[in-house]
Amino acid sequence: MVYRGFGLDQVSPPENKPFDQLSPEEQGEKGAQMMVEFMTSCPGKAAISGVTGFALGGVFGLFMASMAYDTPLHTPAPTNAPGLPNKVKELADLPLKQQIKIQFSDMGKRSYSSAKNFGYIGMIYSGVECVVESLRAKNDIYNGVAAGCLTGGGLAYKSGPQAALVGCAGFAAFSTAIDLYMRNENKKPPKDDFDE
């Protein structure tokens, strides 16, 4: 096996020797080769998507939770917060320190919940898409459609067949729209309007 591109045609991967018998350069090359192999495998892609989805979901959840407090006078007080008297109807009736404590606690919970959901969906979708692509041995838009349908249907199957069908259609449509947008740069360039 020889690496392709970027002038690496002359570089071969290290021989199959025990790791401790390799030179430092060969150890680095072997480590890089192992990382690339992991990152291009289906479990690796699923793990990377899960971690990335968790991080982005946390940021998104934190942002959305912070937007929930844009009108503090009309924000109802949480009913299950410990130490709150029953007569408190709105968050603005509480002392400032308690308001801040409740808001940060709520933002943390919402952020973590959103992070878990995004990570879970990203991991499942990416893993299913990789498996579908491996089974079909093609890289086209239908992999994303099938993965979206299987992911959406799989996530909603506990709610019944109608919900699974709606989840399948919704995820497949969203995946198709994203894939069409991302593959847009592979199209034929537009006609030159100076020739007309």
From Swiss-Prot:
Cysteines paired by S-S bonds: 42-130, 149-168
A GO CC term attached to the entry: TIM22 mitochondrial import inner membrane insertion complex
Sequence segments annotated as region (Disordered): 1-27
One BP annotation, GO: protein insertion into mitochondrial inner membrane
Gene Ontology MF terms in the entry: mitochondrion targeting sequence binding; protein transmembrane transporter activity
Keywords for this protein: Disulfide bond, Membrane, Mitochondrion, Mitochondrion inner membrane, Protein transport, Translocation, Transmembrane, Transmembrane helix, Transport
Membrane spanning residue stretches: 47-67, 141-157, 162-182
Membrane topology reported for the UniProt record: Multi-pass membrane protein
Assembly notes: Component of the TIM22 complex, whose core is composed of TIM22 and TIM54, associated with the 70 kDa heterohexamer composed of TIM9 and TIM10 (or TIM8 and TIM13).
Family: Belongs to the Tim17/Tim22/Tim23 family.
PANTHER family tied to this protein: MITOCHONDRIAL IMPORT INNER MEMBRANE TRANSLOCASE SUBUNIT TIM22 (PTHR14110:SF0)
Protein name per the record: Mitochondrial import inner membrane translocase subunit TIM22
UniProt source species: Kluyveromyces lactis (strain ATCC 8585 / CBS 2359 / DSM 70799 / NBRC 1267 / NRRL Y-1140 / WM37) (Yeast)
Lineage: Eukaryota, Fungi, Dikarya, Ascomycota, Saccharomycotina
Chain's gene name: TIM22
